């Protein structure tokens, strides 16, 4: 049975290096006003797409990958803003848990990030995370692990950074990972969210993001391909 692997990014810049690194002929399949790139790599069927920015877009694309293409694993590759001093520009981070930091039902005495019949922290795949650590050890890469928070806002202030660390013990912030992990969890599909740091989520984040986006996306893409090689 051919293994089917879904590979996601949020932006075109995040999947361009992925498509180039695999070096196979991809069929382009339009669906839901998006394009899915389908190819065969080392007897594995891989489906690559960028969702566009935000939780709604990434939810749609992840669901499409699972229901329309039948992927059995989902790997997310992209960039994120660092919330802690230990994470520097171009460092790699794998999400052990993810949170929707902009969910606020505190008016009903619910904790931030909580939705009824759900949970605050969304788990990722232990086996895929273990594979990521194995690849990192073999390549002598200092892969970090931690909580990543996701929300429909680009975080660029010291105050918001401090809040996210205090409230969720988060290491990094982005705009898609939690929704990807949530969909995968509900459909029983193993998921790994890998991020390379592009900025420090502070007042200079927009300039840093633009400057380091391409390099950070390359870093994450190369590591992801190494993981696929071992699946």
Annotate each PLM feature.
Residues 21, 127-142, 183, 219-230:
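Generic non-transmembrane alpha-helical segments
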Residues 71-75:
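Proline-aspartate-enriched helix->loop->beta-strand connector
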Residues 201-231:
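His/Asp/Glu-rich mid-to-C-terminal helical/loop segments that flank catalytic regions of hydrolases
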């Amino acid at each position: 049975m051919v293994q089917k692997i879904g590979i996601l990014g949020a932006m075109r810049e995040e999947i361009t290096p992925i498509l180039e690194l695999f070096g196979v002929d991809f069929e382009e399949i339009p669906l839901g006003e998006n394009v899915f790139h389908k190819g065969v790599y080392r007897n594995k069927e891989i489906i690559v797409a960028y969702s566009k920015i935000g939780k709604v877009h990434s939810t749609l694309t992840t669901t499409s990958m699972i229901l329309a293409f039948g992927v059995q694993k989902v790997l997310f590759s992209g960039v994120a803003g660092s919330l802690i001093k230990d994470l520097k520009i171009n460092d790699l981070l794998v999400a052990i848990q993810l949170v929707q930091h902009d969910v606020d039902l505190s008016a009903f005495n619910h904790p931030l990030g909580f939705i009824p019949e759900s949970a605050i922290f969304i788990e990722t795949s232990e086996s895929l995370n273990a594979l990521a650590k194995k690849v990192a050890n073999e390549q002598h890469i200092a892969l970090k692990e931690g909580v990543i928070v996701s929300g429909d806002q680009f975080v660029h202030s010291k105050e918001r950074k401090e809040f996210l660390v205090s409230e969720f013990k988060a290491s990094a912030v982005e705009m898609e990972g939690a929704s990807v992990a949530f969909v995968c969890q509900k459909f029983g599909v193993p998921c790994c969210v890998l991020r390379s740091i592009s900025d420090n989520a502070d007042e200079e984040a927009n300039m840093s993001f633009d400057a380091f986006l391409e390099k950070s996306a390359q870093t994450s893409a190369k590591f992801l391909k190494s993981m696929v090689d071992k699946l």
